[in-house]
Swiss-Prot record:
Gene that encodes the chain: atpE
Species per Swiss-Prot/TrEMBL record: Methanococcoides burtonii (strain DSM 6242 / NBRC 107633 / OCM 468 / ACE-M)
Family: Belongs to the V-ATPase E subunit family.
Protein name: A-type ATP synthase subunit E
Keyword Cell inner membrane: no
Bilayer topology annotation: Peripheral membrane protein
Pfam families reported in the protein's UniProt record: vATP-synt_E (PF01991)
Subunit architecture: Has multiple subunits with at least A(3), B(3), C, D, E, F, H, I and proteolipid K(x).
InterPro entries in the cross-refs: ATPase_V1_Esu
Amino acid sequence: MGLETVIKDIMSAAQTEVNVINADADAEVSQILDDARQTAKKIMGDRLAKAEDDIKRLRQQEISSANLEVKRAMLNARKEVLDKVYNNAIDSIVSLPGSKQEELLKAIIDENDSNGSNIYSNKDSEKLVRKLSSLEYAGNIDCIGGLTIENSDGTVRLDYTYDMILKNVNEQSLKQTSDILFG
């Protein structure tokens, strides 16, 4: 009987040790699983946060892009309107009555005749310029109206064509014109 008791004691101690080892293993497995779950949750949370940030960034880029397109379209529309106003001004100048043309040319010539020796104009204004100016008529130039005065050696040209005057006025008052048209 002594051997059986020793065997039982050994078996009981072994079983207790196995139970302790199994409990420790179960606890370690449980801890590993909990850690893995926590790590997975953190990874999922990080990825979800990154995905949300990416979505916000993409949305902001799309909004910015759309705003830029709207501004570009508005600027193009405004430019078209300003170009139309400019072209209407050209049409108005071209269709001025003869008396108004003569009045404008006379004012330019009276102011600047002494600054040169040659004068140029477009073909339509040639007779009128010859009549109004004492300068030598030097030929026709391509313009909607007005004239150009040149000194005797051709080194200085004063451009009083309506094209140049309108261009200068347009450049100087573009912002004001835009403010009037578009508020």
